[in-house]
């Protein structure tokens, strides 16, 4: 089987997968995407005093402000998740979750930790795609009304979302000389570039979903660590943040790359 035949078979499989799952894939994508906010909101509830004391100690802001911060995080994240899953006021929910990301980036000093900053930006990319999807749903209500060609901010949201999502994979690159690490870096980088430029996008994004899910289950198996150990919370945080990026990639699979992409430009050539 030649290279073109192999690529064609893979694309046929991706198209078949999309046809079979198109009814529920967006719902799974949204659930995966908001999973890190859902988990963090629930954790805020059960670790209220620990989170409050951490903020108070770090910023020396006092009991009241620290408690207000934890409450805002808890309420903002759980409310945003409920709105996204119920498909109500999704755009407002996305803006609220963007605010939570920005707030946590500052409060937990993530701004100075490149790895966690890139993961937060990737999470923001997933929210951009969710925002683009909500705009698309709104426009579908007026399907019979003539509109301008897809020159709205939606296509640029999709582009920005794709570019930000690939930052997640940059945090997974290994800089040792083992064969597996080199192979993983080459394949991962190639797929990242394809998703970013929007070429063979659905196939590349679906491949990244499978690869990232396997890595996530293997390296972030928090359920194998006793709850009382700090590593349990650390791995759980990584696991659900990775699941959110997987949700963003599933939205790319479900919605396509948008107007600013190689796949779209090929149709005009």
Swiss-Prot record:
Entries under InterPro entries matching the protein: Surf1/Surf4 (IPR045214), Surf4 (IPR002995)
Record's keyword terms, sorted: Endoplasmic reticulum, Golgi apparatus, Membrane, Protein transport, Transmembrane, Transmembrane helix, Transport
Keyword check for Iron: no
GO biological process: endoplasmic reticulum to Golgi vesicle-mediated transport; Golgi organization; lipid homeostasis; lipoprotein transport; regulation of lipid transport
Pfam families for this protein: SURF4
Domain of life: Eukaryota
Membrane topology value: Multi-pass membrane protein
Subunit structure, as described in the record: Found in a complex composed at least of SURF4, TMED2 and TMED10. May interact with LMAN1. Interacts with ZFYVE27 and with KIF5A in a ZFYVE27-dependent manner. Interacts with STING1. Interacts with SAR1B. Interacts with TMEM41B.
Function according to Swiss-Prot or TrEMBL: Endoplasmic reticulum cargo receptor that mediates the export of lipoproteins by recruiting cargos into COPII vesicles to facilitate their secretion. Acts as a cargo receptor for lipoproteins bearing both APOB and APOA1, thereby regulating lipoprotein delivery and the maintenance of lipid homeostasis. Synergizes with the GTPase SAR1B to mediate transport of circulating lipoproteins. Promotes the secretion of PCSK9. Also mediates the efficient secretion of erythropoietin (EPO).
Domain notes: The di-lysine motif confers endoplasmic reticulum localization for type I membrane proteins.
UniProt-recorded name of the protein: Surfeit locus protein 4
């Amino acid at each position: 089987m030649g290279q073109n035949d192999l690529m064609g078979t893979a694309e046929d499989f991706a198209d078949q997968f999309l046809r079979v799952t198109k009814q529920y894939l967006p719902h799974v994508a949204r659930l995966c995407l908001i999973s890190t906010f859902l988990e963090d909101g629930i954790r805020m509830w059960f670790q209220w005093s620990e989170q409050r004391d951490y903020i108070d100690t770090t910023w020396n802001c006092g009991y009241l402000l620290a408690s207000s911060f934890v409450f805002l995080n808890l309420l903002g994240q759980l409310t945003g998740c409920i709105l996204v899953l119920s498909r109500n006021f999704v755009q407002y929910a996305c803006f609220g979750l963007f605010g939570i990301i920005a707030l946590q980036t500052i409060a937990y000093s993530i701004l100075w930790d490149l790895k966690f900053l890139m993961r937060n930006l990737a999470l923001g990319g997933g929210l951009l795609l969710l925002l683009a999807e909500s705009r698309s749903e709104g426009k579908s209500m007026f399907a019979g009304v003539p509109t301008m060609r897809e020159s709205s901010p939606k296509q640029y949201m999709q582009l920005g979302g794709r570019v930000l999502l690939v930052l997640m994979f940059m945090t997974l690159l290994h800089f040792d000389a083992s064969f597996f690490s080199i192979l993983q870096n080459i394949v991962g980088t190639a797929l990242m570039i394809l998703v970013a430029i929007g070429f063979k996008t659905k196939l590349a994004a679906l491949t990244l979903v499978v690869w990232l899910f396997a890595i996530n289950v293997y390296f972030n198996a928090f359920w194998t660590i006793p709850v009382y150990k700090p590593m349990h919370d650390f791995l759980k945080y990584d696991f659900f943040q990775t699941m959110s990026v997987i949700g963003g990639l599933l939205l790319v699979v479900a919605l396509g790359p948008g107007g600013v992409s190689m796949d779209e430009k090929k149709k005009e050539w």
